[in-house]
Every structure is written in structure tokens, then in C-alpha cells.
């Protein structure tokens, strides 16, 4: 006997609901059903909290073309690997799944901005949601910039199907005047702003920088050792 359930998300007009108390049927009911049925699966929102995964179950974050579409929780014989997993789906490619064991033994996050390597990697969002960025750090021989930000620094280039790679051009502590000066000196007027792990809003940053040149650039706003930094990069993969 097996079963599946897709709890409805509570309606909110302002922001996404992440509380399991707001879904229907309730998370308690879903777990109760799973305790009675040998094989159960539940499809939940990508914001499913890691700590809510039942003992022995598999919480699988799934992405399609880089966007996380769901977190599926599996019980009993439907479990392929207990714990947190990430499955990446892309057109024309086989599904790729990472597990917690793939991330074990990763180096700790960078201790300073000076330790930043020549390449910045950004894993698929399912990998980040599942908390498995360490798998990328291990693969490329690098380290996450700060705990939980999702960016990985490494010294060497490596093509990873489930990650984007950027060449680091410059990096500095976040300071509007300093970043504006660096960009203006290179005639940058069109700026792609990426961010992870910081509260800065890209459009507000764009207004503060007041750029007017004809060149293009990309900046990643993130954290290193708890400090907000700006990393200027060129897309490489």
C-alpha cells in the first residue's frame, strides 16, 4: 500500500508562507498518515525547513532549468537516500542527484576576503536549498564564501553541469563610493547585480551607484566571514 499527498499552501498576499502550521492538511496529519501507510510521499514548497524532516525520511529538493519547483518528502520504501537530497533536472540531460554524503568533509568557509580564489561558483538552486553547497566545494577543491550563502570560491576552473562559474575580476568590502569608483573608472553603465546572503536590494544599489558608461559588468553582493562584500566577476560557464 502506498499514498501521496500534496498539502495546499495557505494564502498570503504579501509573502511566501514557510510555516508548516499553515498548510492543509496539517504537517502533523501528513506525518500521521505516513506512520500508517508503508510508502508515502508529500509534495511541499521549496521553503520546507531542514529541521522538519522526519527521522529516516528523505527530503528531496527538485529544480527544473535552475528553478526550485518543490521539496518532496518520502517515507518507507520510497526513500532512496535518507536525509536531504537535491535533484537537478535540465532539458536533454539525465537527472542528477546529490546527497548529504557528497557534501561531507567540505572545507570550512573562507576566513577572509583575501582568501578568495580566482573563480566563483554558484550551484543550482536545489543544491543551495538542500544545504548541499559543500558538495560543490569538495568537487572544485574550494570553500563556501560564508556559511549558507551558496557561493563557492576556488583557485581553478572546472566545468560543473549543475553550477555556473565566474572569473573573479576584483573583490572589495561593500562600500558605495569605492564600488562606484571602480565601475566608473572602467566606463560601466550597465550592471548585472547578483546577491546571496545579504539584505541589499539590487535596484536600490543601482540607484546609489548612478552609473552612466557604455560598458557592462557583473557584481555579486554577498558575505565573506560575516562581512558584506562586492565581487566583480565575468561569466565563464
Regions from the PLM with identified roles:
Residues 1-237:
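SAM-dependent transferase fold signal centered on methyltransferase-like domains
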